[in-house]
Regions:
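Extracytoplasmic copper-binding redox domains, predominantly the cupredoxin/blue-copper superfamily
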Residues: 20-151
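Positively charged n-region of N-terminal signal peptides that target proteins for export
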Residues: 1-4
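General helical structural elements
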Residues: 6-7, 146
């Protein structure tokens, strides 16, 4: 009987060691943050496939939504409601561009990088408006620096 209990305990431990739970990252939508005004904080989010992001409407008057064309093939689009939190699960590897619709031109954008992205050049080619162009250039530079540092 004791051997069976030990075997069952070892089997259960091995099953638990092989499983992983998905993570949820919280991103604040702010009128003013460490990087300036009208920002997502953090603006560069790295995830594993299956992880989620909860966009939190810390300051009212913001939303989070995908930018047309700036997501991988098979990636899910979403549009969060104004002034409300929205949680999004990212299953498809790739780069996702996120914007706050009313403050997009002011540079209120974020980049979600899931797994190993295959759509980086496609994402870079999407035209951006106003200050969003500069913010995305900075985010792509940070992404490249992180890749170089990881080698």
């Amino acid at each position: 009987m004791r051997r069976y209990l030990v075997a069952a305990a070892v089997g259960a431990a091995m099953a638990m060691a092989g499983s992983a739970t998905a993570a949820e990252v919280e991103v604040k939508m702010l009128n003013k943050g460490a990087e300036g005004v009208m920002v997502f904080e953090p603006a560069l989010i790295k995830l594993a496939p299956g992880d989620s992001v909860k966009f939190v409407s810390t300051d009212k008057g913001h939303n989070a939504e995908t930018i047309k064309g700036m997501l991988p093939d098979g990636g899910t689009t979403f549009v969060g409601k104004m002034g409300e939190d929205v949680a999004v699960k990212f299953d498809q590897a790739g780069i996702y561009g996120i914007k706050c619709a009313p403050h997009y031109g002011m540079g209120m954008v974020a980049m979600v990088v899931v797994g190993t992205p295959a759509n980086e050049e496609q994402a870079k080619a999407v035209p951006q408006v106003g200050k969003a162009k500069q913010v995305f250039a900075t985010l792509f530079e940070r992404l490249a620096a992180n890749k170089t540092a990881a080698k």
